[in-house]
């Protein structure tokens, strides 16, 4: 048995069992090489539709397609060995009907070999979540700020910060949990509300701009590494790789223009003639 085949990959039930346990660590990844790095330290790798912003320069996640998610999901699966890989269902791939959602989710699971899918929405998506889970599709929910709804929300603003706005978000979280999701992301929600939801639902909550009381946390990798020019309020920068990468590129360009690169150690000499 190879070393790789001996490593057990985490599953949705493993994450479900972490409710009120050790905090769940989740980061995004879209490439095999970053997945290999994230895999060593994280419980879950999210192949997020944020790849539309990070990789393709879209202003929102709305233009992301199912084929784009599958392509990057396959890359992340090849680069990782032990983390649960969750792939986002992009806008337009699941909202029309339960059947559409199952067809899209089945493609993701079959073509990437990932362990779960994630979809946005609460009460309105509960029936779809139940339909998927009943047919063998592990689902991670997503409530609070739902970026795919930007055209109806109008802006990426935190939710639940005004009096009288908690009830719909609580209803969404409860509906997701009762529908059979194994966990849920809570994004950009007032801290006391995120804490209350975490205490009230039976499945793990994973916060992003929510509360330290959540059962886990997630960030976009490029945000926390300092590769994004701007980052949301809820991001802590654990590195500033942007300036480091630019300095390396500047050095390369300088050496090429001055003919300092390639040096003798970077080129191939002729083989000696056979005697």
From Swiss-Prot:
GO MF: 3-methyl-2-oxobutanoate hydroxymethyltransferase activity; magnesium ion binding
Note on how the cofactor is bound: Binds 1 Mg(2+) ion per subunit.
UniProt record, GO biological process: pantothenate biosynthetic process
Source organism superkingdom: Bacteria
CDD domains, A to Z: KPHMT-like
Family annotation (InterPro entries): Pantoate_hydroxy_MeTrfase, Pyrv/PenolPyrv_kinase-like_dom, Pyrv_kinase-like_dom_sf
EC number: 2.1.2.11
Active-site residues, record numbering mapped to chain: 187
Disulphide bridges, residue numbers: none
HAMAP family named in the record: PanB
Protein name according to UniProt: 3-methyl-2-oxobutanoate hydroxymethyltransferase
Gene name linked to the record: panB
């Amino acid at each position: 048995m190879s070393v790789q085949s001996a490593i057990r990959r985490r599953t949705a039930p493993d994450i479900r069992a972490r409710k009120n346990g050790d905090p769940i660590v989740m980061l995004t990844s879209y490439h095999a090489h970053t997945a290999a790095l994230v895999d060593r330290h994280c419980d879950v790798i999210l192949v997020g539709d944020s790849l539309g912003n990070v990789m393709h320069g879209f202003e929102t996640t709305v233009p992301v397609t199912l084929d784009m998610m599958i392509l990057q999901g396959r890359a992340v699966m090849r680069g990782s060995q032990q983390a649960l890989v969750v792939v986002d269902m992009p806008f337009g791939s699941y909202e029309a009907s339960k059947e559409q959602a199952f067809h899209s989710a089945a493609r993701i699971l079959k073509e990437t070999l990932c362990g779960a899918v994630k979809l946005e929405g609460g009460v309105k998506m509960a029936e779809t979540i139940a339909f998927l889970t009943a047919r063998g599709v592990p689902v991670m929910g997503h409530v609070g700020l739902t970026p795919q709804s930007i055209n109806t929300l109008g802006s990426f603003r935190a939710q639940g910060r005004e009096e009288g706005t908690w009830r719909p978000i609580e209803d969404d979280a409860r509906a997701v949990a009762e529908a059979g999701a194994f966990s849920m992301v809570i994004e950009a929600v007032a801290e006391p509300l995120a804490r209350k939801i975490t205490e009230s639902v039976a499945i793990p909550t994973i916060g992003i701009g929510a509360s330290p009381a959540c059962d886990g946390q997630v960030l976009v990798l490029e945000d926390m590494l300092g590769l994004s020019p701007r980052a949301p309020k809820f991001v802590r920068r654990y590195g500033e790789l942007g300036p480091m990468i630019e300095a390396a590129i500047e050095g390369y360009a300088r050496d090429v223009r001055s003919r300092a690169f390639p040096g003798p150690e970077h080129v191939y000499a002729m083989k000696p003639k056979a005697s």
